[in-house]
Amino acid sequence: MKLLHIDSSILGDNSASRQLSREVVEAWKAADPSVEVVYRDLAADAIAHFSAATLVAAGTPEDVRDAAQAFEAKLSAETLEEFLAADAVVIGAPMYNFTVPTQLKAWIDRVAVAGKTFRYTEAGPQGLCGNKKVVLVSTAGGLHAGQPTGAGHEDFLKVFLGFIGITDLEIVRAHGLAYGPEQRSQAIDAAQAQIASELFAAA
């Protein structure tokens, strides 16, 4: 099984989402040693944001693309193929200013591709990635789950994943991290307990 592990936090070793996403992957490997992990750090190796140049590159025949267009097309193709090849995805998704990191949004824009991850039909849009499992590691300084302030974070990610057909979704949540050392410790402990006792108990 191929597992795509994505981190998007800019905080490096101080990141709770990185710590927890790593622990999810480690637990997954312990439950299934055959797992092949591909790691993408969207902060250290940021993907260029979706732009007019991206669309122009996609619409230009390969043999007449200039260097910039070739780079854009290659980036889009490699990012998409990496996602399509994965059987499962672990996404570290901290909340920044009520939404996901811009680096994660740039990745989403490269994998939300009509005809590849979804398609339009007479009955409406149809997701094409229903065979994938996703574990979303959601972290935030405040308490936003189920609140209007969380609409651009977890809710947005659930809408996107559902749109491309993913229904096998687990959320590991550590919120309230900025409410003090005790609250932070409790939130991380609860997330770690979920990883250890729930995610892979039957794996």
Swiss-Prot record:
Binds 1 FMN per subunit. Pfam families: Flavodoxin_2. InterPro entries: Flavodoxin_fold, Flavoprotein-like_sf, FMN-dep_NADH:Q_OxRdtase_AzoR1, NADH:quinone_OxRdtase_FMN_depd. It is an enzyme of class 1 (oxidoreductase). It catalyses: 2 a quinone + NADH + H(+) = 2 a 1,4-benzosemiquinone + NAD(+); N,N-dimethyl-1,4-phenylenediamine + anthranilate + 2 NAD(+) = 2-(4-dimethylaminophenyl)diazenylbenzoate + 2 NADH + 2 H(+). GO terms for molecular function: electron transfer activity; FMN binding; oxidoreductase activity, acting on NAD(P)H as acceptor; oxidoreductase activity, acting on NAD(P)H, quinone or similar compound as acceptor. FMN binds at residues 9, 15-17, 95-98, 139-142. The keyword Flavoprotein applies. Its EC number is 1.6.5.-, 1.7.1.17. Its cofactor is FMN. Keywords: Flavoprotein, FMN, NAD, Oxidoreductase. Belongs to the azoreductase type 1 family. Homodimer. Quinone reductase that provides resistance to thiol-specific stress caused by electrophilic quinones. This is FMN-dependent NADH:quinone oxidoreductase 1. It comes from Pseudomonas putida (strain ATCC 47054 / DSM 6125 / CFBP 8728 / NCIMB 11950 / KT2440).
